């Protein structure tokens, strides 16, 4: 493992990005036709009568009338009382910067669908947007901004038109153009969401948190960054190192406390533990379980080698942490475990609930994982290992443990953990999880009211 800036968490944020149908007219700078150009150049030098123009160009009367009608239609000329034809103010404007050749604006119309996020009014490319806000933290947009979004879009489109051309948001073959006017703005259905992943890093030399990176896909982001900071402060957290010490003792993990002992990650100690697990054919990691590619490669290898006649339990017990599951990558890993169930195991994702009857929390989880089959979504009573420890296990094969450390040194949770295939250790970890799920919810109640901490399917 190289000693560079270390990513310890990755979180998706979303901002409402309404869709609008925008129709606009634009002007293209274009040299005028030969006759037009020389006739305009002549009139710039001196006013003329029709007969003089006919003589100068060798036109007959009809050709002269057609040429003059064209200029008159565009309001580039007018007749004086003495019969002389002169350039109008509009005609004089065609000669930009005292150039000899005139340039005229050709008006064209264009329409398209555009998306604009509502915090810094950045227009967005389609692939930076998402129809869903699941697996992310939504940043707050003021109601006033939502109600005035059409007018904000109009002003921003006008003011940043050239920049939108350069950023390839507005796609036109012609490049040297300018906006003439916006003809129509029409909101289009349910808004999209601007989705971006914010990486949270620490410095390996000191363990200190690094400042957040800018969002790479947008130019304007002052309000976005302020909204992220406000949201993180709103979530807040108390230091849970004391509770983690108890969880580590339950797991029989003597190593991780040394890594976090001072309230920050000791990278040198982390490397020692990493190498120790590597020597034991295990894996030690920093970050969310669902971000560990090597971990899931090992898991997939184990699953692919299972006997299809076996009927093992593959359980994933989520922690009680606001940042858990707030990144789209979790969806792919869960779906992968669902798809491989034909290999001979029963997969369940256990999600923490304050009580069995809490319909609001159940519905929130169902919405959060709305693209996942509800046949694998289970509820359990929050509080397993103080809610700070996540477990993923397959009976008789492996166990993954991830502690979710809330430390004052870091703005968000620092997940850290390990995978083991040591059967003795695996069985110990699995017994902790199974004993908790089967333990009575109300041990002092009558037998009919005792209940279990395993609440069963979220949607029976």
Enumerate the language-model features and the residues they cover.
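Short acidic, hydrophobic short linear motifs in intrinsically disordered regions
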Residues: 45-56
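Short alpha-helical segments that sit at the start of domains
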Residues: 8-39, 51, 63
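A short, conserved structural fragment
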Residues: 72-82
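Minor-groove-contacting beta-hairpin "wing" of winged helix-turn-helix DNA-binding domains
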Residues: 83-89
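Short, amphipathic alpha-helical interaction segments positioned at domain boundaries
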Residues: 89-141
């Amino acid at each position: 493992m190289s000693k560079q800036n270390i990513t310890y968490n990755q979180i998706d944020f979303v901002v409402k990005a309404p869709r609008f149908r925008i129709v606009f007219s634009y002007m293209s700078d274009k040299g005028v036709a030969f006759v037009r150009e020389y006739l305009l150049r002549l009139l710039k030098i001196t006013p003329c009568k029709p007969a003089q123009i006919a003589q100068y160009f060798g036109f007959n009367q009809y050709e002269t009338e057609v040429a003059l009608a064209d200029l008159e239609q565009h309001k580039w000329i007018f007749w004086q009382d003495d019969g002389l034809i002169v350039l109008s103010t509009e005609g004089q404007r065609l000669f930009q910067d005292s150039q000899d050749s005139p340039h005229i604006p050709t008006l064209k119309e264009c329409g398209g669908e555009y998306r604009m996020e509502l915090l810094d009014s950045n227009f967005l490319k389609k692939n930076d947007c998402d129809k869903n806000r699941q697996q992310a933290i939504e940043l707050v947009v003021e109601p006033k901004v939502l109600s005035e979004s059409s007018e904000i879009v109009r002003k921003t489109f006008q003011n940043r038109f050239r920049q939108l051309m350069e950023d390839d948001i507005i796609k036109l073959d012609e490049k040297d153009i300018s906006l003439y006017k916006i003809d129509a703005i029409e909101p289009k259905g349910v808004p999209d969401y601007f989705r971006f992943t914010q990486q949270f890093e620490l410095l390996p030399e000191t363990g200190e948190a690094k400042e957040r990176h800018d969002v790479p896909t947008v130019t304007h982001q002052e309000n976005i960054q302020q909204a992220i900071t406000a949201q993180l402060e709103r979530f807040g957290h108390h230091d849970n190192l004391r509770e983690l010490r108890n969880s580590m003792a339950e797991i029989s993990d003597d190593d991780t406390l040394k890594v976090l002992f001072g309230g920050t990650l000791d990278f040198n100690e982390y490397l020692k533990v990493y190498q120790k697990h590597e020597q034991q054919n295990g894996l030690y990691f920093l970050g969310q379980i669902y971000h560990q590619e090597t971990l899931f490669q090992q898991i997939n290898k184990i699953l692919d080698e299972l006997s299809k006649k076996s009927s093992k339990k593959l359980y994933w017990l989520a922690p009680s942490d606001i940042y858990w599951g707030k990144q789209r990558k979790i969806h792919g890993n869960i779906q992968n475990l669902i798809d491989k169930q034909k290999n001979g195991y029963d997969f369940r994702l256990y999600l923490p609930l304050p009580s069995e009857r809490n319909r609001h929390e159940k519905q929130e989880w169902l919405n959060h994982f709305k693209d996942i089959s509800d046949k694998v979504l289970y509820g359990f009573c929050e509080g397993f290992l103080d809610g700070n420890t996540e477990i993923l296990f397959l009976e008789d094969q492996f166990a993954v443990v991830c502690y979710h450390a809330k430390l004052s040194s870091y703005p968000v949770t620092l997940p850290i953990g390990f995978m083991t295939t040591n059967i003795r250790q695996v069985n110990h970890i699995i017994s902790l999880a199974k004993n908790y799920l089967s333990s009575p919810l109300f041990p002092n109640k009558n037998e009919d009211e005792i209940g279990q901490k395993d609440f069963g399917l979220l949607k029976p």
